[in-house]
């Protein structure tokens, strides 16, 4: 009798578990989708909230875009090209007035000096790791630590 009751309880539990929907990402995090304008191929590889409320997004293809009012109506978000021609940027972070971008071969400091919304000053902050050109080599950056330092994680083959 006890074995039958145990089996019945186990079967009922398994049936309930099967009936429950598999969890999805939105069960844990709020997901906001931003419509990407025609002509932009977005392979998002880094995001950073800027002090002025814009959202900086970099693409693995080498562009950085600024999105205005990212918390507003998604259909009214304006995209503007901030920088282009970067080498597989995989991180963005803002620190001390500079937008830092970790590219395949360097950590770059980027700034819009003349205030026109486009980056016009690019400075190498660090490039001490070197690359061979192998397609599996990537550099991933972190947010600045307590000392303001960025740590670079390398995938070298």
Predicted regions and their residues:
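Beta-propeller blade termini and top-face loops
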Residues: 20-157
């Amino acid at each position: 009798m006890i074995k039958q009751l145990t089996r019945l309880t186990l079967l009922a539990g398994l049936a309930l578990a099967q009936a429950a929907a598999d969890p999805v990402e939105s069960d844990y995090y709020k997901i906001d989708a931003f419509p990407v304008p025609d002509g932009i191929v977005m392979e998002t590889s880094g995001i950073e909230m800027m002090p002025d409320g814009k959202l900086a997004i970099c693409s693995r293809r080498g562009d950085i875009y600024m999105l205005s009012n990212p918390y507003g109506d998604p259909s009214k978000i304006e995209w503007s090209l901030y920088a282009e021609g970067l080498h597989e940027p995989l991180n963005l972070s803002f620190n001390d007035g500079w937008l830092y971008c970790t590219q395949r071969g360097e950590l770059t400091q980027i700034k819009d000096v003349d205030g026109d919304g486009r980056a016009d000053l690019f400075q190498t902050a660090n490039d001490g790791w070197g690359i061979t050109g192998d397609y599996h080599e990537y550099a991933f950056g972190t947010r600045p630590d307590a000392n303001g330092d960025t740590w670079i994680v390398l995938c070298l083959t």
